[in-house]
Amino acid sequence: MWIGPNTDIYTVTHPVNAVERRKYLAKVLPVTIGNDVWLCGKVTICPGVTIGNNVVVATGSVVIRDVPDNIMVAGNPAKVAKKLDKE
């Protein structure tokens, strides 16, 4: 796996509701990253996301949903930009 500079991988989230936030509740949601993945610079991976094998995440992308195998994603939020060859 390659990780570019200023890439953030988050695993903790908090409630949006103010009353719940005051209770200091936090939820840990693991991030899973497959093989042969390239996270370019300034990528943000949000809690609970699974990134498949042979994936490229373009510079500046914010990944809020799972990414399947053999895909390049880009944007905020990250969307499929291209299908990649398996090899």
For each feature predicted by the language model, list its residue ranges.
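Conserved hydrophobic/aromatic beta-strand scaffold that supports enzyme active sites
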Residues: V62-I64, M72, V80
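Beta-rich strand-turn-strand
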Residues: C40-V56, S61-R65
